[in-house]
């Protein structure tokens, strides 16, 4: 699986995720505005955080 990886204000890069079947994109509102995180897997999230998990290469754009 190939996913985009990104933390907050960084530019998204692609990464290979051995053994993973999902990519995710999650976002929430913070004191600096909307915060976006992308990566491998499909983590559980706290209330108030929106997450979208997907199952194809680079699907978390």
Swiss-Prot record:
Name the principal localization, coarsely classed: secreted
Q: What tissue specificity is annotated for this entry?
A: Expressed by the venom gland.
- Cellular component annotations (GO), alphabetically ordered: extracellular region
What GO molecular function terms would the record report?
A: acetylcholine receptor inhibitor activity; ion channel regulator activity; toxin activity
Q: Where in the cell is it found?
A: Secreted
Q: Which domain of life is it from?
A: Eukaryota
The record's disulfide annotation reads 3-23, 17-40, 42-53, 54-59
| Gene3D superfamilies to which the protein is assigned, alphabetical | CD59 (2.10.60.10)
Task: Kindly give the CDD domains that the UniProt entry links to this protein.
Answer: TFP_snake_toxin
**What job does this protein perform?**
Binds to muscle nicotinic acetylcholine receptor (nAChR) and inhibit acetylcholine from binding to the receptor, thereby impairing neuromuscular transmission.
In the record, the note on similarity to other proteins reads: Belongs to the three-finger toxin family. Short-chain subfamily. Type I alpha-neurotoxin sub-subfamily.
Which protein, by its recorded name, is this?
Answer: Short neurotoxin 4
